[in-house]
From Swiss-Prot:
Keyword Membrane applies: yes
Major localization class: membrane
GO cellular component: plasma membrane; proton-transporting ATP synthase complex
Keywords: ATP synthesis, Cell inner membrane, Cell membrane, CF(1), Hydrogen ion transport, Ion transport, Membrane, Transport
NCBIfam families, alphabetized: ATP_synt_delta, PRK05758.2-2, PRK05758.2-5
Organism: Yersinia pestis
Descriptive protein name: ATP synthase subunit delta
Localization per Swiss-Prot or TrEMBL: Cell inner membrane
Membrane topology summary: Peripheral membrane protein
Amino acid sequence: MSEFVTVARPYAKAAFDFAVEHQAVERWQNMLAFTAQVTRNEQIAELLSGAVAPETMSTTFIAVCGDQLDEPAQNFIRVMAENGRLLVLPEVLQQFIQLRASLESTVDVEVSSARALNDEQLAKIAAAMEKRLSRKVKLNCKIDKSVMAGVVIRAGDMVIDGSVRGRLERLADVLQS
């Protein structure tokens, strides 16, 4: 089964990259779910594990799927059939779903400041962090008097210290060395 994971990874990544590029992630996930279900059919599974020519296999598989597959998805199936990989479609679907989840996930960003920030400041911070992290962000604001002025932003293990206190500490370190 771990072999299926390794084999499916590049196919899932290619399908996902194509879907994102063409803004069709939902449609591709649905098509992959349908094809994964088709491979679970006993008769189709026998056909796929038999010694059938790749062209015949892909033609039959696409015919079974009918109009559920658009042209790029049919090409994807042909490539997988040429390489004898149609049986890993369920794993391709699982990895596609994981890639989609990581793309659409949000990052919790903690913003500490000496005083409450206004909506415009929060919007600028959110936009900058979304650009930097390439993800949607959810700001959690807290007031911390020790910051003095400026902000300290934490996202996972990344810390951006734009506070006066942080600047003074860095200046003190430079002067002591």
